[in-house]
Amino acid sequence: MSIASYAQELKLALHQYPNFPSEGILFEDFLPIFRNPGLFQKLIDAFKLHLEEAFPEVKIDYIVGLESRGFLFGPTLALALGVGFVPVRKAGKLPGECFKATYEKEYGSDLFEIQKNAIPAGSNVIIVDDIIATGGSAAAAGELVEQLEANLLEYNFVMELDFLKGRSKLNAPVFTLLNAQKEALKK
């Protein structure tokens, strides 16, 4: 199967909720994909195929998943690729010494952490999450990968809200599996 055919089938499983969590947003819930093992496998296969095509000569060493929805498919993708999985968590959730990065949210700021010994310097890393909106949390994860002195190859997202221009904040190429939302909902 091609990436486009995987995406077409996966898109049919999404549930849409207009004006959630705020006015102008069409929330596309991708959780129904995980209720169907066949669709979940196709989600993983689509990302794996993309990464094999995008980086045929490069060994990927780690998948870094953002709390919390990056945890839903990041470990399974890492397993399918035969690489390690490393979580980026909210402050205070990881033991030991951690690097920290702040990001802005709608109502203030938040802090992400990654363990200092999680990834050896020079490792090749892919960051995954469910959606890119404003790009703040993904940019913070990218900053953490830089603090580890690893090579951030790409950000991978299931979906994207294009009109929020989040990818402009990111320091590496972006791949979005499912069709992006080009504009906000009309009021």
From Swiss-Prot:
Pathway(s) this gene product operates in, as recorded in its UniProt entry: Purine metabolism; AMP biosynthesis via salvage pathway; AMP from adenine: step 1/1
Outcome of swapping G108A: Small decrease in activity
An example Gene Ontology molecular-function term: adenine binding
GO CC terms, sorted: cytoplasm; nucleus
Superkingdom in the source lineage: Eukaryota
Keywords assigned by UniProt, alphabetized: Cytoplasm, Glycosyltransferase, Magnesium, Metal-binding, Nucleus, Phosphoprotein, Purine salvage, Transferase
Effect of R89A: 2-fold decrease in activity
Annotated positions binding AMP: A133, T134, G135, G136, S137
Keyword Metal-binding among record annotations: yes
InterPro entries, A to Z: Ade_phspho_trans, PRibTrfase_dom, PRTase-like, UPRTase/APRTase
Signal peptide (residue range): none
Compartments (UniProt record): Cytoplasm; Nucleus
Enzymatic reactions: AMP + diphosphate = 5-phospho-alpha-D-ribose 1-diphosphate + adenine
EC number: 2.4.2.7
GO BP annotation list: adenine salvage; AMP salvage; purine ribonucleoside salvage
Cofactor(s), names only, from the UniProt record: Mg(2+)
Record PTM Phosphoserine, positions in chain: S68
NCBIfam families with a match to the protein in the record: apt, PRK02304.1-5
Its biological purpose: Catalyzes a salvage reaction resulting in the formation of AMP, that is energically less costly than de novo synthesis.
Note in the entry: Present with 11200 molecules/cell in log phase SD medium.
Annotated family: Belongs to the purine/pyrimidine phosphoribosyltransferase family.
HAMAP family per record: Aden_phosphoribosyltr
Subunit note: Homodimer.
Protein name: Adenine phosphoribosyltransferase 1
Organism (species): Saccharomyces cerevisiae (strain ATCC 204508 / S288c)
Lineage of source species: Eukaryota, Fungi, Dikarya, Ascomycota, Saccharomycotina
Chain's gene name: APT1
